[in-house]
């Protein structure tokens, strides 16, 4: 990707990272390397368990396999560069590299968000309209939902990337972050960021809040339906099926709202923690959360491990 913004005198950015202390760098490298390997391994096991187990060939697990794939790509867009910078004295990223990382950060993060909304809709249909579940969640419809979830977010990401590329960056090139995120990069621009801020404060929240409301509506309807079930075992099964989805949604959206539902000018170092949660920790924890109380997935993982041993 060649640098397009010829009006900038900045050809690279410096990422300050999580700590400026040299003695912390190797510790952080080992910590995030372990997290990255656990993320890749855990999500890959979920994908393989679903792929090779006939009992898991359902819409719910179809969506889960794509969520795991997206989580692998999402984490890979962030962590490898972090690991390189932990061991490097010059913690730099090229202008083109910064735009590329930001593009995939937004595209894959929004794909995650879309897939969580689709999975909530799937559970809503399964619990609230079970007689039409096979028709509504047919394989054709599932493929279309996944295709939309993985393609539409790229338009959102492309919009922010192109608007950012129009800006001029003069002398300051130090990003107070461990990755190229929109708000800290906008702070470095020596040209007007009015349009960027308007888009970020209107389009981005609308996209995020709309998906979150879809998820909230789905689970409110599920809750009201489950409470009407006379059988205690039926209630327990429905709650256990949806409980881990709510855990993932809370973890993912809670951290995202902390970062992005605020003006770019108010972005602070404290937001690093929330960014780590939704870019790194969420992707690592998802496989454990999904398999913790899911007997079918546990059985699928056991079968997969027994085949490999």
From Swiss-Prot:
Positions bearing carbohydrate = 5
Under PANTHER family, the record lists: OLFACTORY RECEPTOR (PTHR48001)
Q: What is its main location?
A: membrane
**Intervals, Cytoplasmic compartment:** 51-58, 122-140, 221-237, 293-309
Return the protein name: Olfactory receptor 1L8
Q: Briefly, what is this protein's role?
A: Odorant receptor.
Per the UniProt record, the source organism is: Homo sapiens (Human)
> What's in the keyword line of the UniProt record?
Cell membrane, Disulfide bond, G-protein coupled receptor, Glycoprotein, Membrane, Olfaction, Receptor, Sensory transduction, Transducer, Transmembrane, Transmembrane helix
Q: Where are the transmembrane segments?
A: 27-50, 59-80, 102-121, 141-159, 198-220, 238-260, 273-292
Q: Which residues lie on this side of the membrane: Extracellular?
A: 1-26, 81-101, 160-197, 261-272
In the record, the note on similarity to other proteins reads:
Belongs to the G-protein coupled receptor 1 family.
Where found in the cell? Cell membrane
